Curated annotation (Swiss-Prot):
<keyword id="KW-0007">Acetylation</keyword>
<dbReference type="InterPro" id="IPR012677">
    <property type="entry name" value="Nucleotide-bd_a/b_plait_sf"/>
</dbReference>
<keyword id="KW-0507">mRNA processing</keyword>
<feature type="repeat" description="B-1">
    <location>
        <begin position="119"/>
        <end position="133"/>
    </location>
</feature>
<feature type="compositionally biased region" description="Basic and acidic residues">
    <location>
        <begin position="129"/>
        <end position="142"/>
    </location>
</feature>
<keyword id="KW-0597">Phosphoprotein</keyword>
<feature type="region of interest" description="2 X approximate repeats, basic">
    <location>
        <begin position="119"/>
        <end position="164"/>
    </location>
</feature>
<dbReference type="GO" id="GO:0005737">
    <property type="term" value="C:cytoplasm"/>
</dbReference>
<dbReference type="GO" id="GO:0048024">
    <property type="term" value="P:regulation of mRNA splicing, via spliceosome"/>
</dbReference>
<feature type="compositionally biased region" description="Basic residues">
    <location>
        <begin position="143"/>
        <end position="158"/>
    </location>
</feature>
<comment type="function">
    <text>Splicing factor, which binds the consensus motif 5'-C[ACU][AU]C[ACU][AC]C-3' within pre-mRNA and promotes specific exons inclusion during alternative splicing. Interaction with YTHDC1, a RNA-binding protein that recognizes and binds N6-methyladenosine (m6A)-containing RNAs, promotes recruitment of SRSF3 to its mRNA-binding elements adjacent to m6A sites within exons. Also functions as an adapter involved in mRNA nuclear export. Binds mRNA which is thought to be transferred to the NXF1-NXT1 heterodimer for export (TAP/NXF1 pathway); enhances NXF1-NXT1 RNA-binding activity.</text>
</comment>
<feature type="repeat" description="B-2">
    <location>
        <begin position="149"/>
        <end position="164"/>
    </location>
</feature>
<keyword id="KW-0539">Nucleus</keyword>
<keyword id="KW-0677">Repeat</keyword>
<dbReference type="GO" id="GO:0005654">
    <property type="term" value="C:nucleoplasm"/>
</dbReference>
<feature type="region of interest" description="Sufficient for interaction with NXF1 and SRSP">
    <location>
        <begin position="1"/>
        <end position="90"/>
    </location>
</feature>
<dbReference type="InterPro" id="IPR035979">
    <property type="entry name" value="RBD_domain_sf"/>
</dbReference>
Amino acid sequence: MHRDSCPLDCKVYVGNLGNNGNKTELERAFGYYGPLRSVWVARNPPGFAFVEFEDPRDAADAVRELDGRTLCGCRVRVELSNGEKRSRNRGPPPSWGRRPRDDYRRRSPPPRRRSPRRRSFSRSRSRSLSRDRRRERSLSRERNHKPSRSFSRSRSRSRSNERK
């Protein structure tokens, strides 16, 4: 029988399998709780499996008993499958497509736009010293012929003046 034809309450998701997902070990562990229809272990990407039971009560017992146990060398997450297929491209969840575009814009700008603005804003604030202070710095650099030292000194002086 095909793995998608089982009712959801018979289908169990097994997560956190790592790369060592072993069909035989899963069949043995889950078969203890009742007859299985099938066991499917993901290979690309690895790390999860689906186990189908004949009876939904057996699936519920397996979830209750095996969640958090060690199988195939890993502490696994076991839960009833919710039936949603995940896309391989790991794009935005399907619910994002349902939201009207105008509504999304009203809530907040996209994250990509927000962080460069924040950065440029903080830069402009840190550079917004008065023109007199900028002149003071450039004059002290010319006098001392050691730009890095005089720059750091004048910078620390201006900070201490602001605090007082």
